[in-house]
Each structure stands twice: as C-alpha cells, then as structure tokens.
Amino acid sequence: MGRGPSIEARKNASDSKRGKIFTKIIRQIGVAARAGGGDPSNNPSLRVVIDKALASNMSKDVIERAIKKAIGEMEGVQYEEVRYEGYAPGGVAVIVDCLTDNRLRTVSDVRHAFSKCGGNMGTEGSVAFMFKRLGVLSYAHAIADEERITEAAIDAGAEDVMVYTEDDEIEVITTPEAFSRVKEEMAALGLMPYHAQITFRADSDIVVDGDTAIQVRKLLDILEDLDDVQDVYSNVDQVTLGKR
C-alpha cells in the first residue's frame, strides 16, 4: 500500500501556499498605499487590504514594511493593476485581476493559460458587462439573528441582505464605496463578519458538466496559481465544479 505525503511534505506545501498568498496581499497593500496614501484611516482601500492581511495572519511588521515601500520610505518594486477578460470552454466568462511589474510577462502567462485549457482571451469589456462589482460581508447566524443583522445593515446603508438557511449564513451586500463604512458601523454593534471582500458577482451562472467542467476547473486553478494574478472571477455555477 502506498503512503501519503509525509508531515514535512504537507507542511512545505502549506508554507508554499501561504507564501504565495502573502506575496499577493503585499502587492495589493503597495498599490492601495500608493494610490491613496499610507494612512488606513484616510484610505478605505488600504484598510480593506490590511484587514485581509490580518485575517491571513500576516504580521503587522510585514504590513508596515509593505506600506513604507509603497510610499517611498523604503526601496521596493513598483506594481500596476491590469485586468484581462476572456472565455473558458462552454462560454464561461472569466475576469482576471493582476498586479504586475512586467505587463508582457503577465499577459503571456494569462493568454497561455486560456489557450492551454481551450479558452480564449477577449478585449477589454468583452465579459465585464456580465458582472457587478459589490461589497460582500458574510455573517454566521450564530452571532446574531437575521432580524438584527438585517436592521443593522439597512441602517448602515447596505444595498441588500441575503439569507442562506442551509449554509447558516447571512450576506450583507453593499456598493464598493459603502463597503468600509457598513463594515465598521456593523462592527461597532458587535457584528463581526467572518469574511469580507469587494468582489465581482455574475448576473447569472452557466452550468457546465463532463469534460467541459474539467477544463473550466483546470483553467481557473492555473490562473489562480499564477504569481501575478490577484483574483479570478467567473460566471460558472460553482456547484458543477464541486467548489461548494
């Protein structure tokens, strides 16, 4: 009987994955700080990324160094935001957000991923119209009842509240501009989300199966694993990919 990966191998794999996550978050911190300054109290975008970093157990020292590099107090690489759009097999729309110091390298890597998996890159705006940019705050029913969360969300200026009884989850939907304010006002009432992000949500999902589902899953996994890629969004039904 074959043996599974050793404890050391599993730890190395976990450390590698954690390192990639940290690298991507540090780039996000840099871009946010350069765009809006290094003070998170006056830079909502930076505040969001710092919260994400802390949730990933990044130390405050690492966060502070990333901010200092971004605002010129320490030497560092300069990154820019780029977005690519395209189609996976089955007509699945895909948005790829990247941070890069070399556009040629990044577009080559992204295009290769699409081609390898039977998809194709599109032009700017070719699929973005199928998505909405939203702030999403996720709460567990255990922290408060549905009525209390809904009332607090509406008072704070949320756009909508979605209740998922089967998943024991309540989602508060905001505009990107109101995201930080709603999150902070609800936190002041003791309502802390277990997950919070500004994301793209598809207007409707596409169901795929068989070999198409395998190729779509492969493409999304390859894209997410690229160093320059920060986020990957698609309108594929996640249940059909076994990701829910």
UniProtKB/Swiss-Prot annotation:
InterPro entries referenced in this protein's UniProt entry, alphabetically: Integrase-like_N, TACO1_YebC-like_2nd/3rd_dom, TACO1_YebC_N, Transcrip_reg_TACO1-like, Transcrip_reg_TACO1-like_dom3, YebC-like
Keyword Transcription (UniProt): yes
GO MF annotations, alphabetized: DNA binding
GO biological process, one term: regulation of DNA-templated transcription
Subcellular location: Cytoplasm
Keyword DNA-binding applies: yes
UniProt cross-references to Gene3D superfamilies, sorted A to Z: 1.10.10.200, 3.30.70.980
GO cellular component: cytosol
Listed Pfam families: TACO1_YebC_N, Transcrip_reg
Keyword tags: Cytoplasm, DNA-binding, Transcription, Transcription regulation
Family designation: Belongs to the TACO1 family.
Name of the protein this chain belongs to: Probable transcriptional regulatory protein XF_1906
UniProt source species: Xylella fastidiosa (strain 9a5c)
Taxonomic path: Bacteria, Pseudomonadati, Pseudomonadota, Gammaproteobacteria, Lysobacterales
